[in-house]
């Protein structure tokens, strides 16, 4: 089972969010983690919107989340918050599905004002699901260069601090100790 699941909440196949996640997955794999990137847009829309957690494709991702040691939950900012696509997936998970897990929230957006989406939109939802929410990060769209396969890059102003946060996240996941929570 993957030690880290990356939930990609962008509805676009060529998103800047996905480009950043590809770079992070490569970094985490280099640290020895098993990483599974899940583009939520590829899940079947009917079962996703109906919150059918028993549909095979949905159940597979729910199981991956349940067994992961850590998660990166990422989304572009739409209307000052994370995407409805990501919200639809989070809504079908059990209330405390992220209990005891280390989670890194990541948001991309076109305006520096959207940095607030990390702490005021995404973080509260993840915390309400029991996650240990680590340092989040916002990447300004203009600092992301999307290229062909393996050709995406981040400007140094975004890359250095983000990789530092990802390295700390990697260490937290590596030192993971299961916690049993009785509700």
Region locations from a protein language model:
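N-terminal beta1-alpha1-beta2 submodule of the flavodoxin-like/Rossmannoid cofactor-binding fold
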Residues: 1-94, 160, 167-183
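A short small-residue
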Residues: 1-6, 47, 102, 138-150
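Short coil/turn segments at secondary-structure junctions
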Residues: 8, 73, 105-109, 149, ...
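Alpha-helix initiation/capping motif
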Residues: 13, 50, 54, 111, ...
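Short connector loops at helix/strand junctions that flank enzyme active sites
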Residues: 67, 98-101, 117
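Short, conserved loop/helix-junction motifs that constitute active-site signature segments
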Residues: 95-99, 130
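Short, glycine-/small-residue-rich phosphate/pyrophosphate-handling segment
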Residues: 103-144, 156-160
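Glycine-rich phosphate/pyrophosphate-binding loop and the adjoining helix
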Residues: 132-183
């Amino acid at each position: 089972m993957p030690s880290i699941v990356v939930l990609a909440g962008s509805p676009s196949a060529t998103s800047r969010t996905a480009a950043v996640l590809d770079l992070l997955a490569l970094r985490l794999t280099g640290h020895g983690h098993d990483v599974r990137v899940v583009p939520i847009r590829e899940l079947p829309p009917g079962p996703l919107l109906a919150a059918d957690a028993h549909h095979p494709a949905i159940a597979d991702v729910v199981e991956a989340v349940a067994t992961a040691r850590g998660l990166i939950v990422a989304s572009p900012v739409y209307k000052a918050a994370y995407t409805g696509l990501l919200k639809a997936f989070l809504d079908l998970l059990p209330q405390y599905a992220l209990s005891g897990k280390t989670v890194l929230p990541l948001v991309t957006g076109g305006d520096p004002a959207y940095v607030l989406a990390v702490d005021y939109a995404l973080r509260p939802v993840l915390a309400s699901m029991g996650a240990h929410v680590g340092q989040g990060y916002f990447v300004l769209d203009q600092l992301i260069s999307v290229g062909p396969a393996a050709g995406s890059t981040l400007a140094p102003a975004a890359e250095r601090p983000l990789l530092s946060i990802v390295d700390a996240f990697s260490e937290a996941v590596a030192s993971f100790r299961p916690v049993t929570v009785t509700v």
